[in-house]
Amino acid sequence: MKLSARIAAPAAALVLAGLTATACAPGTSDTGAEGDAKTGTLRVWLFQEVGNKPKEKVVDAAVADFEKAHEGAEVEVEYIPVDTRAQRVKAAFNDPKSAPDLIEYGNTDTAGYVKDGGLADVSEEFAAWDEAKDTDPTAKQSVTVDGQVYGAPLFVGVRALYYRTDVFEDLGIEPPKSQDELISTAKKIRREKPDLYGLAVGGAYTYGAMPFIWAQGGELADETGVTYRSAINSAKARKGIEAYTSLFGDDNCPAAKCAAMGGNATVTAFASGKAAMAIGGDFSHAAVEAGAVKGRYAVVPLPGVTAGSIAPAFAGGNNIGVLKSSSHRTLAVDLMKSLTGKETQAKMFDAMGFLPTYTDVLGTAAEKEPFVGPFVETLGAGAKFVPASPAWGQIDASLVLPTMFQEIASGRKDVDAASDDAAKKMDAAFAEAG
């Protein structure tokens, strides 16, 4: 294996919520490939992580096995910053000669990259791949657009409820078992311990708010056959919005401080001992372990509306896809399988803590590391995904939902007005995307 000399500098940690920034990128051209060479150099772009060495070791092992099994093939890996990936990928779609053969991409980018014509349809190969039959359905959904498969899932990430065991023990309370109980527990803690946020929430924490909407039976958007129509202002969605925004106030998390917070800020508040609860991902575990609350917290699934139920979580994560422009399609698909197969995902979990996308490998991971249990349980209860539309990148990048939450939290608009405005913006994006 050859490691590219253009190793990217470390970037900010990847947020599994899917960071999309495709709106201002240039248009794409025809990216169809010519030929299918069975030897030569395959180029791969993977994301640079904070603390990337463990990931590199896992990738190196997978590549070595691939090269051993494919005489005459070499692999060159380049690690690129997450925050500039949109520009790099768009440029690659426009210039096939300089493009890699495979890329790692966030699962909320799938539909946009498919619309741009950059990703190869690997439906046939995926269906014939024996390991793929054990792929978690939600993970498979993240590589599927209009029934066709455009890559293989690499890892999945979901969120659950982190809580301070010492605070709960001191107050004689149990972890909340319903959404109403979550809200009342948060406010009780704030009342009894005013130096703490009961539940750290953020107006810019889109993927922490979504479970409240989904738990009430609401949806972000409804598929209408050829496109989507916003459902964020439906009666059920508004119940979820109202529940989430009720947590912004002096009786839990003051809007003046919390309205601007995103997911990282809420987890940081918890890890530093400023909050009794937070909605964090399996990928937040290392940060919490490194914080002031180490040894004084536990994790349970975020409760749903009915006591004992689990609120649907957003299934974030990353995939590996073959570019349509690759002149080594057969080799590239085989390398995709090597980089996302069960053996590699098991090693990646051990090295990086990324949750495997295979149900059997995920079960083994949960047995090995108990902290994974609540996240596996959350996945098993039925995680959800964003609309499979290229418009989602624009909706996410233009902060449509954070603006809605912040307007409500600040008192500038009520739930009805703010959700109506958000729905109009979403529908405009869906219409533009076609």
Language model segments and positions:
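Conserved N-terminal structural module of periplasmic/extracytoplasmic solute-binding proteins
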Residues: 2-112, 306, 330-331, 417, ...
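Glycine-centered hinge/linker elements that transmit conformational signals in sensory
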Residues: 186, 229-257
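Hinge/lid segment of periplasmic solute-binding proteins
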Residues: 107-158, 212, 298, 367-370, ...
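Long, aromatic- and glycine/proline-rich binding clefts that accommodate carbohydrate-like moieties
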Residues: 300, 350-397, 407, 431
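Extracytoplasmic/periplasmic substrate-recognition and gating elements
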Residues: 68, 171, 246-252, 289-354
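Conserved C-terminal helix/tail region of periplasmic/extracytoplasmic solute-binding proteins
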Residues: 169-170, 381-434
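Periplasmic solute-binding protein
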Residues: 114-118, 138-174, 201-226, 315-321, ...
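Short, solvent-exposed loop/beta-turn-alpha elements that line the ligand-binding surface or hinge
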Residues: 123-135, 199, 218-239, 289-292, ...
